[in-house]
């Protein structure tokens, strides 16, 4: 029936069309037969991909790009939380988690016309806990054809929904100790006492007794304590030093009157303690509170906000060992501060102790040996690279950097405001021209070049005229002594003849070996760091030789060349041990959690010196002649000393009136009980090497081999007591003294 009805309608419509007159059919448009129709214009809008939006948000989170994360929030979410609070939520969570790395991935997507849900998984790698993993749901809404995030706290962790927060409870182990090679503490956590004197409260006749007790407690030399007392006598309070609480209690047990003596003040504190006002403070270093700009970084490592960290030296290098592993529990707390659940927990592990290569007794004496000068002295075990002492002067008391120490109020300015820069480690951070000490390298280059032999003779006169238009003068000219005359090469080093070495530098340059001397210096370890990584280090400077003037300057250790005392000590050690350049090291071992060592010292070879055994022996012999031959520049400084010493004097001219005083050498005793050592000493703008640094070198050997000084300095009335004002340079030291550009006419030996 339906089919018939449809057919009837079709017939009626057909009849109606056929009955219409043809003349009434009028086209609606005027078109030419066969003309193409216009191309339809279609506009297709693609639906945005919710998964792509979610992945972008998670990628921004991983990069901690909070600005772009916030820009992806829906309007209602941005209205609910300001940008600053949004960032704070993520940073607080990251700090509590001790987050180190975040990885997220989308698991699935459910999309509706105007909303979507994206399931994702986040994996949190933390420094304090095992890996934390959570599966979460992200809700999105379509706004202006763009997917936006409906944000809430649960997008960080599901446990944070409803305004919950994370809370981290940290338990830190006691910081490990830094010790010398024999186990003597150089830094430790301890109950300490700040010791000072109120001059107006000192009973008549008791000042000497109180000062001697203060010196005994603090380990500071009595002379130094007396000087502090005399200098600050008119002050209300005189800060003397620090001591262990137990030591003070023991002394008070022997002298009960000390407790009631108002003149001697004791103020207790508990913190990092450095004995005797700092033994090797530049090498050991110190701790400080976490700087504000690094607080977030250390929070993520599990440090509490009030923690102290190693700020320099071995305290900084060994932070991971010394800090141990902090125990911690991670809680979820509700808006009222009530614990909801514990997310993670780990147990603390004890810290480790660092045993240095330093000998505390030797170090203390080396520090005293250069006290009063600006400069440095370094003692290295010749055949291994162990650093036995590293002293920089002026020194400083690390205890004064602790705000818990009452004395820091009164004396911290001595450290930070001093023009002598006591915090600067001159042993490794100050580079100097080294003067005639460099002639050791020049002699090596001369012998290895084939242009000279140890028997080559040169006439050492007052003048050197081989440079056109310039006359240079030997040190004997300024001293008004006879010129040295004919000298073979070994005697040239012994006499430190400047014309001899100017001649070598010039001949190497003119023979086409323009950089031969510079390359030899680099092979001896100059011009780059030694590789010690336990303290900051300057690499010095050895530049290519560009002219004849450069050549003669470099040959005597002047011009643009610069080196640190550590580099020079390491260099002469290599000469003395047969040609092996070792990496200097400060750490003997690190004692692990179970008493076993997690690090043990091993000698590390940098390279072999590029010099034949025969030529090296010639240099060694010449260095021995410097000390033992009656014409040697250091002969008088070592009269009566019977040790086998090989050394070289140096006086490096600077822009100041007086040169830097250098002396560097090594011993060759071959003893089993005391290894041979190499020593470098520099005293800034103090005078000639033979007159100042050679004397300091001698004292260091006396202390090393005999346990105490035996020979007075010319400027002492008794050991460490000056009969005339201590030579104190007037220039302020810098990490790199300005080089002298033109050849020096009267360099000193």
Identify the role of each PLM range.
Residues 48-63, 67-71, 84, 88, ...:
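Solvent-exposed, polar/charged alpha-helical surfaces in well-ordered, non-transmembrane soluble domains
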